[in-house]
Swiss-Prot record:
Taxonomic source organism: Maricaulis maris (strain MCS10)
Gene that encodes the chain: aspS
UniProt-annotated site: Important for tRNA non-discrimination, residues: H33
UniProt lineage: Bacteria, Pseudomonadati, Pseudomonadota, Alphaproteobacteria, Maricaulales
InterPro entries named in the record: Aa-tRNA-synt_II (IPR004364), aa-tRNA-synth_II (IPR006195), aa-tRNA-synth_II/BPL/LPL (IPR045864), Asp-tRNA-ligase_1 (IPR004524), Asp-tRNA-ligase_1_N (IPR047089), Asp/Asn-tRNA-synth_IIb (IPR002312), AspRS_core (IPR047090), GAD-like_sf (IPR004115)
Protein name listed in UniProt: Aspartate--tRNA(Asp/Asn) ligase
Binding locations of L-aspartate: E175, R221, H455, R503
Gene Ontology biological-process annotations: aspartyl-tRNA aminoacylation
UniProt key word Transmembrane helix: no
EC numbers on record: 6.1.1.23
Pfam families, sorted: GAD, tRNA-synt_2, tRNA_anti-codon
Subcellular location as annotated: Cytoplasm
Length: 605
């Protein structure tokens, strides 16, 4: 018999009754019933109940051992009596009567419990993550993570993609976040950077003649933590394809994503239809966000014309003074009560706004009656036209937000979210995907009075390249600000899973694109010379995308924090509490790297 086990703790069944088995694992729980000692023994696979009588020579030892001690048990598999069968356990029809015991490791008093999984502080959980990972729910999520990544790999291979690895030590590049820098011992005063993404490398793979690339790629960014953003490092399904249009990328990734989510849906629905494509401008207007949660059926409407020149002087005055101002109408089915309208008004005040305008409709003699101060101020005709346009009836309401879209679209979007949640309008147990497309290529930088990139500077503009080269920053500023880019995001249930683009593969177009944003050729050559030079020797049109693996797992696992699907995560301050990182290093190590630390004075107060 094997030294540690003949079976796992999830393997024994009624068919094994009468056999001698050896199992190993952690003491999950101990119970003393009628003089008998019952032990739930746990390993990676499951639980098996072990029983021993008071006369057993090992009784006192097992009574003394703390839970989470590791033992090996040898004994006869016996059937449980009918009244003691545990139907919730795969091994619930049997138990092992202990004959031999080997103690592999004794546990000290635990800093956090495993059995029962009570709430515990995140600091304690992360400091003792190896114990936290024994808890069933987290343990299952980490196994789920492995299965999801395996499924992604299989699906990409089925789409004729080949996995290639890109360097971890690379050059610093001015992307969205700060780099993690690695000093070079061999080249004093110079630094590598950990890649924020394999962006330039995957494009160079296309230039190198490979057709379809993918990688489960580690990415490193020195940025602050959020619930949906892990500090320090994360993984993405990085992909790129040659001779590809935007639609080609969609046609590849959609079946991968739908298939993955369907495989791990666990009773939730994944709609069969193609992902909805929503222009960035429409997303901001309809949902107040470029990552809308489409489980919420509310689609906001531009009500600017309803209020222009109306008796509601607050909105009418804003529209008259600033042509950029927009009024959002947020329809609220079933929200037509003064109590709910007052709650929304209070919510807006907590958000730093003076309040929230509203109209609600109720039954009255002779038909519908519109209530609320806005209805009185804009008049019956405008109120009724708005109601008809939005398809609202008695018992419904409409809320209003007004301002410059750059500042107030987000507030309107949050109001939409609150209305949908409070009124229980949102779909449950489903995944709603969409593409956000047609991002603006440029935007006006009011502070510096110049044109600047709006999102991704390396995407191809939606214009004939030769026509783009003829544009002039001074005379064609309006054309440039109206120009869209071949950029796209995947969004699921309000979570941005990925950004992607058709790449700008022509050096002349790239230099011109950067010139419009105020970058001279020398700066572009210095920052991105490696990729630019490669493009000068024959670059295919190419496009790609990179869905975030951690965020996909978070959605499929049904949790709201990435740390619940990462095996060894950092805390909110990007610290590894278990390994005590970051930490000071020896002076000798710094000398070898020809660097020294200059630690700022601690902040007072």
């Amino acid at each position: 018999m094997h030294a540690y086990r003949s079976h796992t703790c999830a393997e024994l069944r009624k068919a094994h009754v009468g056999q001698t088995a050896r199992i190993s694992g952690w003491i999950h729980r101990k119970r003393d019933h009628g003089g008998l000692l019952f032990i739930d023994l746990r390993d990676h696979y499951g639980l098996t109940q072990v029983v021993l009588e008071p006369e057993s020579p090992h009784f006192a030892t097992l009574e003394r051992l703390r839970v989470e001690s590791v033992i090996t048990v040898t004994g006869e598999v016996i059937a449980r009596s009918d009244e003691t069968v545990n139907a919730n356990l795969p091994t619930g029809e049997i138990e092992v009567r202990l004959a031999e015991l080997a103690i592999q490791s004794e546990a000290e008093e635990l800093p956090l419990p495993v059995f029962g999984e009570p709430d515990w502080s995140e600091e304690v959980r992360l400091k003792h993550r190896y114990i936290d990972l024994r808890r069933e729910s987290l343990h299952k999520r980490i196994v789920l993570r492995s299965k999801i990544i395996d499924s992604l790999r299989r699906r990409m291979v089925d789409e004729n993609f080949v996995e290639y690895q890109t360097p971890i030590l690379t050059a610093s590049s001015p992307e969205g976040a700060r780099d993690f820098l690695v000093p070079s011992r061999v080249h004093p005063g110079k630094f590598y950077a950990l890649p924020q993404a394999p962006q330039q490398f995957k494009q160079l793979i296309m230039v190198s003649g490979f057709d379809r690339y993918f990688q489960i790629a580690p990415c490193f960014r020195d940025e602050d933590a959020r619930a949906d953003r892990a500090p320090g490092e994360f993984y993405q399904l990085d992909m790129e394809m040659s001779f590809a249009t935007q639609q080609d990328v969609f046609d590849v990734i959609e079946p991968v994503m739908k298939g993955l989510f369907d495989e791990f849906a666990d009773g939730r629905t994944v709609p069969d239809e193609p992902f909805v494509q929503i222009a960035y401008k429409d997303a901001m207007s309809w949902y107040g966000s470029d990552k809308p949660d489409l489980r919420n059926p509310i689609k906001m409407s531009d009500a600017s014309e309803t209020f222009r020149g109306s008796g509601f002087k607050v909105f009418a005055g804003m529209l008259e003074r600033n042509p950029k101002v927009q009024v959002w109408a947020i329809p609220a089915k079933t929200g037509g009560s003064r109590a709910f309208c007052d709650r929304m008004n209070s919510w807006a005040q907590k958000e730093g706004q003076p309040g929230m305008g509203y109209i609600f409709w109720r039954e009255a003699e002779g038909g519908l009656e519109a209530a609320g101060p806005i209805a009185k101020n804009i008049g019956e005709e405008r109120t009724e036209a708005l109601r008809v346009e939005l398809g609202l009836e008695a018992g419904d309401a409409c809320f209003f937000a007004a301002g410059d879209p750059r500042e107030f679209a987000g507030f309107a979007g949050r109001a939409r979210d609150v209305v949908g949640a409070e009124l229980d309008l949102c779909e449950k147990d489903t995944f709603r995907f969409c593409w956000i497309v047609d991002f603006p290529m440029y935007e006006w930088d009011e502070d510096n009075k110049k044109i600047d990139f709006s999102h991704n500077p390396f995407s191809m503009p939606q214009i004939d390249p030769d026509d783009f080269l003829k544009l002039d920053a001074d005379t064609d500023a309006d054309t440039l600000l109206a120009l869209k880019a071949y950029q796209y995001d995947i969004v699921c249930n309000g979570v941005e899973l990925s950004s992607g683009a058709v790449r700008n593969h022509r050096p002349d177009v790239m230099l011109k694109a950067f010139a419009f944003a105020g970058y001279d050729a020398a700066t572009v050559e210095e920052e991105f010379g490696g990729m630019l030079n490669a493009f000068r020797y024959g670059a295919p049109p190419h496009a790609g995308v990179a869905p975030g693996v951690d965020r996909m797992i978070m959605l499929l696992a049904g949790v709201e924090n990435l740390r619940e699907v990462v095996m060894f995560p950092k805390d909110q301050q990007a610290r590894d509490l278990m390994m005590n990182a970051p930490a000071e290093v020896e002076l000798k190590q710094l000398r070898e790297l020809h660097i020294r630390t200059v630690v700022p004075d601690a902040k007072k107060g």
